Amino acid sequence: MAIRKFKPYTPGTRQRVVTDFSEITSAKPERSLIVSKHRVKGRNNRGVITCRHRGGGHKRQYRLVDFRRDKRNINAKVAAIHYDPHRNARLALLFYEDGEKRYIIAPAGVKVGQNVISGESVPIEDGNAMPLSVMPLGSSVHCVELYAGRGAQMVRSAGASAQVMAKEGDYVALKLPSTEVRLVRKECYATLGEVGNSEIRNTSLGKAGRRRWLGRRPQVRGSVMNPCDHPHGGGEGKAPIGRAGPVTPWGKPALGLKTRKKNKPSNKLVVRRRRRISKRSRGGRDS
């Protein structure tokens, strides 16, 4: 997989950088694995906006992805690599020996015709799913379960992978993409290898309209709004916030306040917290 740059024929193509989609082998999804999905546009069950700047965009059909990998010890053949409009990662269409078809997150390097399998005594190969207890130390894994049997909940985005650091008792220590080291039960399943389409981080949409196609609406700073729209709004010209610190549109402290509960039960499973990202690495001054 590679990325494509365009000649500056228009302002939109001047900055546009996209993936070349060379790994996509079929344009049409598997009919039995797609369902329609109501788009909530950032609203909750009461119709109140809880996530701003969402709405519009091209219509989508949801692909049913197998995050559990619960067909144990049954060989599956990778029949195709498909595009998924709901995520940056690609999907691999599996044909099982018993005739069932399923989608999984496509690992990096997976090829059409390759066989994958899930179980406790399976080969140590990329794309195979197995419990963390049998994975070699130093292995790169993705689609990690937090609770056995619940399905993969971590490390699912394009190019992501976690590393098996240590095994002790009933737990396995994983170094997550955020650099956090967390303990996970050894019976939880994960898939060997990293998620494919890692070049997505080097792409650029090129124009605002392309972002609208993805269902993202324009973002506006609170300081240029009216007081009725945002706590930062109002004043003459470029007025300061007028508060001790920045807040969210709902008046809660923002930018730096820790929101994780101090007494959360899973705190004991976090061996090392994630590295703090300085303002220098985000393009601003170091804090």
Curated annotation (Swiss-Prot):
GO BP, one annotated term: translation
InterPro entries from the UniProt entry: NA-bd_OB-fold (IPR012340), Rib_uL2_dom2 (IPR014722), Ribosomal_uL2 (IPR002171), Ribosomal_uL2_bac/org-type (IPR005880), Ribosomal_uL2_C (IPR022669), Ribosomal_uL2_CS (IPR022671), Ribosomal_uL2_dom3 (IPR014726), Ribosomal_uL2_RNA-bd_dom (IPR022666)
A Gene Ontology molecular function term of the record: structural constituent of ribosome
GO cellular component, one term: large ribosomal subunit
TM stretches of this protein: none
Keywords: Ribonucleoprotein, Ribosomal protein, RNA-binding, rRNA-binding
Biased composition (Basic residues): 258-287
Database matches in Pfam families: Ribosomal_L2 (PF00181), Ribosomal_L2_C (PF03947)
Annotated region described as Disordered, given as residue ranges: 221-287
SMART domains found in the cross-reference section: Ribosomal_L2, Ribosomal_L2_C
Family recorded in the similarity comment: Belongs to the universal ribosomal protein uL2 family.
Described function: One of the primary rRNA binding proteins. Required for association of the 30S and 50S subunits to form the 70S ribosome, for tRNA binding and peptide bond formation. It has been suggested to have peptidyltransferase activity; this is somewhat controversial. Makes several contacts with the 16S rRNA in the 70S ribosome.
Assembly notes: Part of the 50S ribosomal subunit. Forms a bridge to the 30S subunit in the 70S ribosome.
Name recorded for this polypeptide: Large ribosomal subunit protein uL2
Organism: Prochlorococcus marinus (strain MIT 9312)
